[in-house]
Amino acid sequence: RRLPLESGYFEAYNRPNVRLIDVLENPIERITPKGVQTTVEEHELDILVYATGFDGVTGGYDLIDIQGLGGRRLKDDWKDDLPKTFLGVLNDGFPNLLMVLGPHTSRGNIPRHIEKIVDFNVALIRHMREQGYSRVEARSEEAAKWLAQVVEVNKNRLAGKIPSWQTGVNANVPGRQNIRVLGYYGGATRYREIAEQVADGGYKELMFR
């Protein structure tokens, strides 16, 4: 296990409103509209952050039965070789699902990249609150455009032809033997510029309600 090296972790953990729940003793039964129901009680939450183990890029999402509009399942949308997202952060048809390191985000210094994605998501949530919106999702056509960019910059990349967790190959998972395009390799700097342009332009690529 990696030690928490950031400042403030233990201080945050020891706050009076923080509880450690042993899910081996009190297994999670289901996710509810208010939070998480274990075998013992329901824990009401404002935000739920998933940590589901390591199965590169899409595995953590596949393990959860994430359903969008009309009962669409995210893992069904992503079962082909080209999962579609917008910036690797949002999907069309799955309102308010803001991802960190989803398919087609940039690759590079991962902790730094996570920080930038979280900044993007926080700014988006702040924008929604200021404008009185309660729901956001990617426009389908914008997700398709982003996928086209991702595929284009990956065409001549040698590493994209090698079976590894970064290309979606996992020998331990049935049906996960095909190479897939799962990352944006146009550069972390360029990715951040694109994300900033989206924010500065008022998030025209997204649909709000």
Per-segment meaning from a language model:
Residues 1, 27-30, 56-58, 106-108:
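Flexible loop/turn segments at secondary-structure boundaries
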Residues 49, 53, 119-120:
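C-terminal, active-site-flanking charged/polar segments
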Residues 12, 16-39:
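A conserved short coil-to-beta-strand element within the FAD-binding core of flavoproteins
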Residues 55-103, 114:
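Glycine-rich loop(s) and the adjacent beta-strand/alpha-helix scaffold that form part
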Residues 84-85, 96-209:
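C-terminal, flexible cofactor-proximal segment of oxidoreductases
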Residues 1-8:
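Short beta-strand to alpha-helix junction loop
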Residues 37-47, 51:
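Core beta-strand elements of the Rossmann-like FAD/NAD(P) dinucleotide-binding domain
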Residues 19-21, 49, 95-98:
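Hydrophobic/aromatic beta-strand patches that form the interior of the parallel beta-sheet core
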